[in-house]
Amino acid sequence: MINYTEKIPNNVDLGRDRILQRALEHWQPAYMGWWYDMGPNESHNYEVYLRTAISVEADGWAQFDYVKMPEYRWGIFLQPRDEKRQVNFGIHKGQAAWQDVPGEYRSTLRRVIVTQGDTEPASVEQQRMLGASCPSMYDLRNIFQVNVEEGRHLWAMVYLLHRYFGRDGREEAESLLARRSGDADNPRILGAFNEPTPDWLAFYMFTFFTDRDGKFQLCALAESGFDPLARTCRFMLTEEAHHMFVGETGVGRIIQRTCEVMKENKVEDPSDVRALGVIDLPTIQKYLNFHYSVTLDLYGSDVSSNAANYYTSGLKGRFRETKLDDDHVLADAEYPVSEVIGGKVITKNVPALTALNERLRDDYIEEIADGVGRWQRVIDNAGIRFRLTLPHKGFHRAIGNFAGHFISPDGEVLSEEAWKNHEFEWLPSSKDYAYVQSLMSGRVVEPGKFANWIAPPARGINNQSLNFEYVRFN
C-alpha cells in the first residue's frame, strides 16, 4: 500500500533514506511554485472530484473524492518488484534486471528519463488556460484529472533522478521546472510540447494522439533492464489510460454532435454547418492531420544509432517486447523504412536495430488507426458521406527521412509551390482556429449542461450521473 502519512506519499519506503527524503522535500516547494504559476489558471480554490492512487494493485488502486488541486497528494509509486525479473533483450539478455544504474549507461539513462520527464509538466503548461472555456463541468473535471496526473508523472521521473543520479539528477530535476512550453529562450525538449493548445478540440486531439505517444514510449521504457524505471513506467501506464479515454471520447462527442446537427438541419456544406454553431467535419480532419503529424515526429529519426544503442544496452525495448517471437537481439534482422528518392517515396529494408524508432511509430499508427475507425463509425451511423483518414506518415514532418520534403496526405511528393497552394486544405488555417475559438468564448459549468458543439458522454465518472457536481467553485 501507499504510505500517505509522510509529507511525500510513496511506496518506496522513502523514510529510510533521510538524505533522499530531504532532497525531495527541498524540491517539493519549487514544484508547488511551478504549479501555482503554470498549473490550471485561477483554479486553486476549486474542489474537484478527483481520483487519487491508494495502491499499485490492479483492483481498487484509486479512490475518488473532492480535492483542491494544490492539496493533491502527488507522490512516488512503483509497481512491486519481481525478484526473478531479467533483462529481456540486447547484449545483457538473461542477466538479472539492474537495481542500480550501470556506470557505463549513466548519462544515457539520465537523458532518457529527463526527456520523458520533460513532457509531463509541458502538457500542463499547454493546457492551463482551457478551464476558462470548458464545454461542461464534466469536461472541466477531466482536464484537471489529466493535469494532476501529469504532475504526478513528473514526480515519478524526479524520484528516479534524485535517487539514482546524485547531483546531476538534482540539477536536472530543477531544470524540469525551469523550462516552459513554447518559451523562446528555454523551451521544452520535444517540439510537440511547445505547440499551443488553444481550444478544446486541440486538447482532445492532443490527449488522443500525443498522450498515446506517451503510452508507447512508457511501454518501451517499461521493458527496460533498469528495473526501477520499468516499475515506475508500469504504474504510469495505469493512469495514462484515462487521458487517452478523454481524448478519444472528446473528439468522438464533437463528431457526434456535428452529425446530429447536420442530420437535423439537412446541411452538408461546411459554412452551413458552422452557421449552426458546431465544428464542421473538414475542420476536424485538419486538426487530426496536424496533431497526428507533429506526434509522429516525437518518435525521432527513422534510422537512429541512438535507438539501436538503447536497445542493445537493454535500456529501452520494443512495444510488448516479451511477447515478440524473435531472438530479442536483432543482430541480423531487417525492418522496412521509407524515404524520398527521386521525387518518390521508396521503401527499403535497413538493419532492424537502427529502425526501432520507426517500428515503435508503426505500432503507434496501427493503434491510432483503430481509434480513427471508431470515430468514422459515428459518421457512418449518422448516414453522412464523409471519411476521416490518417494522412501519409510523411505528411507535414519536421524530423526523420521526410523532413524537408512536401508530401500530400495521399503520399504524393510535391513541389514547395504546390504544397503552399494546398496547405490550408490540409492543415488548420488562422480562420479555422478563429472559428473554433469563437465557439469557446465562455464556459459551461452548470451541472448536466453541455456546450452546443459537443454531445454529452455516454456516462459519468465513477458511476456518477452527468448532472453530478464534479467541480465546486469556492
Segments the model singles out, each with a brief description of its role:
Residues 1-134, 138, 164-197, 201, ...:
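Terminal targeting/low-complexity segments that flank the catalytic cores of oxidoreductases
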Residues 119-126, 153, 210-217:
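Amphipathic, well-ordered alpha-helical segments in soluble domains
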Residues 129-185, 237-244, 248-255:
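Long, hydrophobic, well-ordered secondary-structure blocks that form the structural core
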Residues 129-141, 216-236, 250-282, 298-315:
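Inter-helical turn/loop segments and adjacent helix faces that build the functional surface
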Residues 164-167, 210-225, 243:
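Mid-sequence acidic-hydrophobic segments that form the walls
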Residues 230-244, 288, 292:
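Alpha-helical membrane segments in multi-pass integral membrane proteins
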